[in-house]
Amino acid sequence: MKIVAIGVAVAAALVSTSAYAQDIVQTFNGPRIELRAGWDNPDIRATIQDNRNRVSRSADKSGVTYGGEFGYDYSPNNKMVIGAYAGLEGSTTKACGELYGEDRLCVRAGRNITAGARVGAVLDDKFLIYGKGGYSNGRVTVDYQDYELILADENFGHNFDGFHVGAGIEAAVGSGVYGRLEYVYTKYGRISAETDALNASLKPTRQQVVYAMGVRF
């Protein structure tokens, strides 16, 4: 009887452990979709250089980022999660200032497209800490006016390719519902334009702290 009782207890423990591990897997497993919003801080460095002078200014201003993301996560065991994602964001950020003298340069952050992968570790059955990275494509609108009429006025938009890296923590808050907080740094490529007398370039970067709420299905 003692042997039977011990066997039943061991079997019950194994079933309980298996169910616990399965709950963890399901918590951070499968397709997901989310809405996100937070702090956005693009930093766009503009440089103008002629035969004698080189002037560089940085337009750094905070705003609000907003958008959505969808992805798929897979948990091969009860300790690790890997996944892929894609997202689309907008921004309210706009910065204006003097660049070269009697002029005005305004730079507005536009939409941002992201695609990448993430790897995380399950802290317990409700929390996931992760790192992420991937491709970014951000749009910037530039409005330049030269009040001395030395340079031509410009108004144009440009798409910048780049990459992003970040980290965050995610928490399961209900049946299929999760919330997460993350930091993301993005570095975009540079664009340049050249005339007979001047060379101009723009080089943007970006920092974000974002809170997201989503569902798994």
Where are these regions (language model features)?
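Gram-negative outer-membrane beta-barrel domains
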Residues: 2-5, 12, 18-217
